[in-house]
């Protein structure tokens, strides 16, 4: 077992020293999650690496189902399904639950067409040999990591039989902070993965990436802002279409 500690100032390293079977890679510098991932993958020698989050629960067959997908040599990454636990009818829980059902369906359809577009950190796996070191300031490490594998010519398989169950955001404020981080990470990803915007090189993957991700993170916010004044102008114009049955 290997533990990666990143700038921890508690007694983690001291306590782990009592277990000789545990390897501890400690860095006193706070490099962040991506830096820790880079260090961890530097010592991993298994052909497949499965990623998950500490706050998620996997179904019992999850790992076996994910590994089975790699029987196809064209698959370089496998994305599991994220499910939101205890979703109600109001607030952050309902909003997040609906979004992930929609997102999961898109991934399933993308997979049927050619390749899923990215993986969520709650559950995904990669071929170790295809991992590329990420820049330490990468915000969406799971998405960028998986798309860099797709850029090498491998498919991202979607496995709905393997799922990770996660509790929803506590409130709309927490959900708002998470969405802001994803939005910022999305813009960063579009720039850093700009080579995927070449339709002549990436073909179907280009279409999937642009329609599913790039437009959502770049054009959609602009369109939403433009819709407000356009709707106000339409309202004030008294256009008969507003009152048509």
Name each model feature, range by range.
Residues 1-4, 23:
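Hydrophobic targeting segments
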Residues 5-13, 29, 56:
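A conserved acidic beta->alpha catalytic loop
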Residues 26-29, 34-36, 42, 46, ...:
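Long helical/loop segments within the catalytic core of UDP-sugar-dependent glycosyltransferases
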Residues 70-102, 137-141, 146-212:
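Catalytic donor/gating beta->alpha subdomain of glycosyltransferases that bind UDP-sugars
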Residues 109, 113, 213, 217-221:
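Loop-to-transmembrane-helix entry motif
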Residues 166, 216-245:
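Membrane-embedded multi-pass helical conduit in multi-pass membrane proteins
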